Amino acid sequence: MIKAEHQPCRIDRYIDSEPALEAYAEALRGRRVNAVALDMEGDQGTVRYAYSISILQCFDGSETVIIDVLKMGNQPALRHFLTDPAVIKVMFSCANDIFMAQNMLGCTIAPVWDIAVGQKLLNLPTNISDYLNIDKKQKDKFQRANWLKRPIRPEFLDYAVNDVMQLFTIERDIATKLRAAGLFDIYQNESAQISEKDFVIDHFRHYKAKFPGYDRLRPPQQKAAAAVWVFRELIGKHFDCPVGYILSKQAMAACIRDPERTVSSLEQELNRGRSAKRRVEKGLVEKYYQEAFRISGNP
């Protein structure tokens, strides 16, 4: 069992429906709250094929809040909460959270003040663990944990809330130093640029950037590489399995050495170490490779 070395935190609200989130947003307006500390937990291809946002954890200066995004689903109130211009989101190293929001929810997170941006401007180490009462190794364990299981384990929720409760204090200290150095406007502008950046990706078209040595491949191998990349996505979706567990990049590179044998090479790699009962049938490999070849734009 993972245990953080800090005292358990109280959770004031656990929000798992759109009406509950709307009520919380109304409460923020009633209290004239203009900033919340915010963080996100989820899965990026370590538990399932599809990326998923599990929760948002918030602290508004008075209440600690868990928003169960996985249970609630992608609702208009959630997108409004994340983009409400009247509420600044104080975050740490928010680019990946914005990537997830844009790709999973279809919205960005704004406006943001990113503590990591401030640390870089002040030439300070870019980290948050030193400010929190938790060891970096423990923090890494929580971040690698399965946040998709329900109910969420109490120690996971405790970690999540503890992660945001101190962000206001940290940000105020950073902001004071930035103002003294005449860097506060740059801090705000660079934080805003992260929100405005387009992080949306098409996993099927990512082979040019991610397939090993793609630019150096001969044209026949580039065609095979594109198809193999899309094939891995299709097979991952079929089995609801993270693609990295299905075929490593090294294995994909090996499968295109002889484009004429790509299908048989894929079948061999997919079944490496599998029992007879768990073999991936050749017909399934051929079906998805043909579809991948078509999707990737190959003639």
Model-derived segments and their meaning:
Residues A4-H6, Y14, Q57, S62-A77, ...:
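Active-site-proximal helix-loop-helix substrate-binding element of RNase H-like nuclease domains
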Residues G42-D43, A95:
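Short glycine-rich anion-binding loops that position phosphate/pyrophosphate groups of nucleotides
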Residues M1-V36, M40:
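N-terminal accessory regions of nucleic-acid-interacting proteins
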Residues L38, Q44-V47:
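A structured, charge-rich N-terminal accessory region that forms the first stable segment of a protein
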Residues A145, I152-P154, V164, I170-P299:
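Accessory DNA-binding and partner-docking regions appended to nucleic-acid-acting proteins
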Residues T46-S62:
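A short alpha/beta connector and helix-capping loop motif
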Residues V33-N34, S52-I53, A86-V87:
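Short, surface-exposed beta-edge/turn micro-motifs
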Residues D43, V117-L121, A251-M252:
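Conserved short loop/turn motifs at secondary-structure junctions
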